[in-house]
């Protein structure tokens, strides 16, 4: 059987562009351990242009081919694509819509599921409809005096709030507000990232994560891992990726009862199946001191950097990432 031509697409030009490049390197190294794939990695820039790592411009056509601007390079037929793009246009579902249009099989969640999870307002409506408890919130559709008053009222009721751009990556356009006088400026910043904003009650709780993925025909939910931040910080974009980050990650959370651990995993699977996710996800929860479980968010294309939790939790669960990729891809294209 000849190798399949696998397009590894990364970048996107957004706030998480560089993280996407790091994740793509993990995919490259994992795919290289198999003899089933011929891999072409392309970077998508902020202008929507595709190019190779050495700068050759190209395009993905509706004939499922990569055609190069330089006519001396022959067209490259694409059998399968991994859209390793965090944020727009990957996790938003936009690029998946194009793949569907040209009937190109791809890795990861489909367009509607991606869009529903990426928008924090839509996601919360789904969580509630599925009976999965989540953090108390209000949402705002424009920056005006009424929005500021609503947020100030929420602050008065809850004592502290998180203000989040509704349609950005998990830590992009996200601000913790402990001083009421800062609300107007924070809202202005959040609205610069997205047309809708979510204001959530600050939850003082443990931050737990579950890797949920499909493998050998089953939906797998790992034991919860934990993000442990300094008491004066939250898991912001900088805390995730800065070299001097004070945060640490535990692949398996300590001091978690079997009953609570299983309930978190059950909620994660319920959300995965109910929202019709596919292939992979990282589902994040809060656990309060009185054992209240709250779903925080779903990441439909979690990071795969050296510090990322998803690949570590998958491996800790006893699965090999390369074998996992072969299994998922083999459900869609013939690898025999």
From Swiss-Prot:
CC cofactor note: Binds 2 magnesium or manganese ions per subunit.
Residues the record lists as binding Mg(2+) 1: 284, 297
Cellular component terms per the entry's GO annotation: cytosol
Pfam families (UniProt xref): Dala_Dala_lig_C, Dala_Dala_lig_N
Domain ATP-grasp: 124-330
Top-level taxon of the source organism: Bacteria
EC number: 6.3.2.4
Primary location: cytoplasm
Catalyses which reaction(s): 2 D-alanine + ATP = D-alanyl-D-alanine + ADP + phosphate + H(+)
Class in the EC hierarchy, top level: ligase
Biological process annotations from GO: cell wall organization; peptidoglycan biosynthetic process; regulation of cell shape
Family: Belongs to the D-alanine--D-alanine ligase family.
PANTHER family, per the entry: D-ALANINE--D-ALANINE LIGASE, D-ALANINE--D-ALANINE LIGASE A
Name of protein: D-alanine--D-alanine ligase
Source organism: Shewanella frigidimarina (strain NCIMB 400)
């Amino acid at each position: 059987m000849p190798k399949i031509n696998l397009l590894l697409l990364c970048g996107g030009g957004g706030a998480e562009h560089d993280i996407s490049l790091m994740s793509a390197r993990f995919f490259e190294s994992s795919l290289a351990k198999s003899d089933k794939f011929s891999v072409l990695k392309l970077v998508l820039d902020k202008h929507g242009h595709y190019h190779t790592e050495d700068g050759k411009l190209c395009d993905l056509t509706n004939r499922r081919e990569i055609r190069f601007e330089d006519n001396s390079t022959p067209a490259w037929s694409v059998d399968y694509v991994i859209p390793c793009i965090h944020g727009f246009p990957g996790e938003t579902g936009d690029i998946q819509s194009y793949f569907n249009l040209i009937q190109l099989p791809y890795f990861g969640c489909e367009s509607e599921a991606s869009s529903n999870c990426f928008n924090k307002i839509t996601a919360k409506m789904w969580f509630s409809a599925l009976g999965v408890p989540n953090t108390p919130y209000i949402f705002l559709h424009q920056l005006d005096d009424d929005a500021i008053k609503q947020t100030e009222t929420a602050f008065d009721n809850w004592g502290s709030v998180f203000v989040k751009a509704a349609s950005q990556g998990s830590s992009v356009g996200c601000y913790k507000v402990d001083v009421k006088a800062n609300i107007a400026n924070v809202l202005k910043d959040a609205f610069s990232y997205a047309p809708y904003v979510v204001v959530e009650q600050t939850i003082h709780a443990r931050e737990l994560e579950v890797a949920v993925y499909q493998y050998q025909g089953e939906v797998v939910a790992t034991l919860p891992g934990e993000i442990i931040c300094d008491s004066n910080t939250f898991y912001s974009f900088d805390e995730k990726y800065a070299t001097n980050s004070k945060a640490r990650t535990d692949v398996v959370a300590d001091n978690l009862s079997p009953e609570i651990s299983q309930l978190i995993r059950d909620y994660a699977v319920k959300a995965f199946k109910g929202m019709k996710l596919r292939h992979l996800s990282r589902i994040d929860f809060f656990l309060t001191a009185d054992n209240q479980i709250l779903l925080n968010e779903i990441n439909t294309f979690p990071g795969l950097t050296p510090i990322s939790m998803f690949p570590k939790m998958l491996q800790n669960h006893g699965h090999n990432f390369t074998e996992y990729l072969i299994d998922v891809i083999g459900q869609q294209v013939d690898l025999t």
